[in-house]
């Protein structure tokens, strides 16, 4: 309940109070009526599930989306992203990137491969083409979740240029 400063786990409920231990270990007491009047997020579904969801989008520069061509395909095979017969020069580089990203996520030891794994385009925007990475991490503990998620995205950021793609970045007051 953000308005009440309550963001954590309910520790005790009585007729007149609800005691919440926040994630920073502070204790907040709110009335039961506050829970009825305001919205709140119930984390129990995530805690009881087989994974914690990651849904993050990265904007790609439209000017760098194009058919892969022979040279890019050869480079992707040479770097081990694909086998020689898997890709053709007329396939768009973003398509190849999405295919590889899904395969990478499905094989990552921290990703729950029995749950949904999807790398897909969202509605184009002025900031570029948003591509959403949607998957579930097996380790739901906050610190491990954050580190595992960041490790995955740092790798995604690092390999983007290998596919001839560029992440959109808005430059204000300086040259690109």
What is the predicted role of each segment?
Residues 1-88, 95:
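Soluble accessory domains appended to multi-pass membrane transport proteins
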Residues 78-176:
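Long, non-transmembrane cytosolic or organellar matrix-exposed soluble domains/tails
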């Amino acid at each position: 309940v953000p308005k009440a400063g309550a963001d954590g786990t309910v520790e005790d409920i009585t007729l007149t109070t609800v005691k919440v231990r926040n994630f920073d270990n502070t204790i907040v007491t709110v009335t039961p009526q506050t829970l009825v009047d305001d919205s709140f997020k119930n984390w129990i579904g995530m805690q009881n599930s087989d994974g914690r969801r990651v849904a993050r989008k990265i904007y790609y520069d439209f000017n760098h989306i194009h058919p892969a061509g022979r040279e890019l395909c050869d480079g992707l095979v040479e770097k081990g992203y694909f086998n020689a017969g898997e890709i053709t020069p007329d396939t768009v580089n973003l398509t190849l990137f999405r295919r590889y990203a899904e395969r990478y996520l499905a094989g990552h030891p921290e990703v729950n491969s029995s749950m949904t794994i999807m790398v897909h385009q969202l509605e184009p925007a002025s900031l570029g083409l948003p591509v959403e990475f949607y998957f579930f991490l097996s380790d739901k503990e906050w610190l491990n979740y954050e580190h595992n998620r960041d490790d995955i995205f740092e790798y995604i950021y690092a390999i983007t240029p290998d596919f001839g793609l560029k992440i959109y970045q808005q430059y204000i007051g300086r040259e690109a």
